[in-house]
UniProtKB/Swiss-Prot annotation:
GO terms for biological process: DNA recombination; double-strand break repair. The keyword DNA damage applies. This is DNA repair protein RecO. The lineage of its organism: Bacteria, Pseudomonadati, Pseudomonadota, Gammaproteobacteria, Pasteurellales. Pfam families: RecO_C, RecO_N.
Amino acid sequence: MQSELQRGFVLHRRPYSETSLLVDLFTEESGRLTVIAKGARAKRSSWKSVLQPFTPLLLRWTGKSTLKTLTKAEPAAITLPLQQITLYSGFYVNELLTRVIESETPNPALFQHYLKCLTGLATETNVEPTLRLFEFQLLQILGYGVDFLHCAGSGEPVDFSMTYRYREEKGFVASLVKDNLTFYGRDLLAFEALDFSDDAVRQAAKRFTRIALKPYLGDKPLKSRELFTQNILLLK
């Protein structure tokens, strides 16, 4: 059965046989799926230049198994201009989606978050607020429910000036211990508001999302993070 024409993006692509590609897509109506792009590696194939990350596409495919066959791919708009840090940030977002969301699970809301994230990476001078916002939105969609407004121990509202220690599967508990799991109340209130305009809040948010995403990512390192680190070292 052939799918309806859908908006989507390439998350990742790799060789498949001598002339084809195996392509991980993220689509608006069908979520993440893997397709074979037959002949895409051939010299005269128009798909070779079309099937690139960060290019908004119109896509159609066929097949009932988990591995579909791509039948149509054309640009819906120009490729978003990501380069250097923004490019590696885009690869990071793509790898997150590839690693943590289930295949063929429709999620139009996440697609919109992803589209806004890429647009933000392409237009904003600082990538950090855009990345932190997307990570928190992704956690919400994954069902990661944590209360940023109340102490998990007492039920009292979070105090702006107090410190709270994160306990997995429980939440934030008022604590005087200061370590990697400790956050200020002002950070938690900003997390709830999805307000990452302050640099200190962004640093705390980055620390929290690494903790929160670890159960979904497992122990396997993110390749995009390694590439980014290598690139920074080369630039020094």
